[in-house]
Structure formats: C-alpha cells, structure tokens
Amino acid sequence: MRRHLAVAAVSVAVAALLTNWTAGADPADDVTHHEFQVNCDVNHRLPDDPIVLPNLPGASHEHSFTGNNTTNAATTLASLQAAGVGATSCLAPDDLSAYWFPTMFNGNTPVIPNFKQVIYYKSGIIRYQDVRPFPPGLRYVVGSPNSTLDEFRNHPGHVEGWECGDSFFNWDFPANCPAGTQLNVRFQAPSCWNGRDLDSADHRSHMAYPVDGVCPSTHPNPVPMLEFKIAFPVSGNMSQVRLASGRGYSWHYDFFNAWDPPTLAALVSHCINGGLQCDPRGFDQYKPQRGAALGTNYRLPGRP
C-alpha cells in the first residue's frame, strides 16, 4: 500500500513539473530571431552615386536603385524626405531611404531583379535589446568595387558569396547555374556606429563590425545590421555575366537612411528588440499573438 502511495506521489509531482514546464514554455519567449524585412523593387538605373560621387551625374559605374524613387547624383537627406510619403518602391510608404548596388549585365544586357528584393534589418550584436534606430541621414558603403577575390572572401560581411542551385560560397560568379535558377548574393553591413558622423571620407570608417557579438569601444552604438539578399534572374552559362563594377567579387552596396523616424523606431523596438522574425509589417507569423508594428497599409496605426 505504501509503495502504491509513493508511486502515486511521484507521478503527481512529475505531472506538476511537466505542467509547470509546459505552461512556462511560451513560444513568445523563445527568441531565435531579431529582425524585420524590407521588400523593394528595383525602380531605376543610373551611372550615379550620391554618396561616393555627389553632384557628379554620370561619373559612376551604373547602379540599380531601389527604395526612394528620386535617388540620383544630387540626392541629399532633404531631397529624399521631400519626395513624400509613398515615393518608394518599398512596401512601407514611410521608408524613403535609398538603396543601390552595381547593375548586373549578361553580355551587354542588364539583368534586373524582376520582383521585390529582400533587405533584412537584424541585430548584429548578442544583446539585441540594445539595438537602436539609424539616425536620419546616416549613409555608408558596404564592400568595395576594388576588392580582390581574397578580400571579398574574407570580408566580415560575407554570408555565402554568390550562389545558385546547389552551388554556394562562390567568391566570383560560378561557371554555370542550373536552368531556371537565380544567381543570389547575401552580404551584411557593419552595425556599430561611432555616434558622431553621418558619413566619413571613405564612407566606411564611421561604421564598424561587431567583435565577438559586441560593438567595439571606438564604435559603441549598435544600429540595425542590414543584410542585402538580392536575386538576379540569370542562369545557364555565366561566362558573360559581370557587374558594372567588374567581377563578382566587386559586389558592394550603398545605403542612405531616410526612414520616417517613428516608423523605423516602431519596427526596431517590436521586431529587433522584441526578438521576432518579422515581415515588412513587423508581424511574426510564428508568434501571431505578439501582433504587428504596422497596419495592413504598412504604416503606423492611425495613419491613412
């Protein structure tokens, strides 16, 4: 009898522990991501670069622009903001930022991404709760058109290099891509800001990459880590594929922040600081109970 009572007591205790563990295992507390997406179409091409070659139209290799519809060699923060709500190819009408990268060619034919591209805003540091929004007007260049293959391969921003089909970690374009596939590239930006300069002489040194998941003392301010994930609709023989800047390892991109500050702050707070895997509305489909940062019109609640 005593044995049966002891077994019953143990069973009750185990059941209680399991119940408490299950109740405490709220999926909302299981942090595996801290990011949101920006989805934008390529909207124009120009031989301009308002960060590296400001006010010099035609002086650059050709870039494909996404985001703000008005970006050109004369672009400033004021001109991006003056474009007005909705003057963007991105889903969020209040993201008036400009994003651009070298145009890809197959021979002499431009290879233009023909659907919305993905730009991730992530935490680049371990303490994702500390990430803060970009200041208005912050701008920088990621990568370099003058990189060597080894520099591109060893760059702290590389993810998987160029990829297509089952071929990954290519630091120049692969020789062939399976028919019907796309040529993809993913590249991460530095996410630590020096807290003073919106730009620098080389358009890079005011930013830094984290070291072991922590911002260095020279650049102590954590901001979102951009990760461009661009898909080019080209496959087959890649021998004639090139970038306007040169070989595949010359890949680089530019960012000029012109977000509406309250909108960016809401997305950073809800998705990055909140430990969510958000879509462009700031909604995590795996944790729907957490809600969305933006309305169905991709604007802050209450904005038409």
For the regions a language model picked out, list residue spans one by one.
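Primary mode marks residue(s) on the alpha4-beta5-alpha5 output face of response regulator receiver
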Residues: 26-60, 64-187, 194-304
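Secretory targeting and sorting signals
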Residues: 1-26
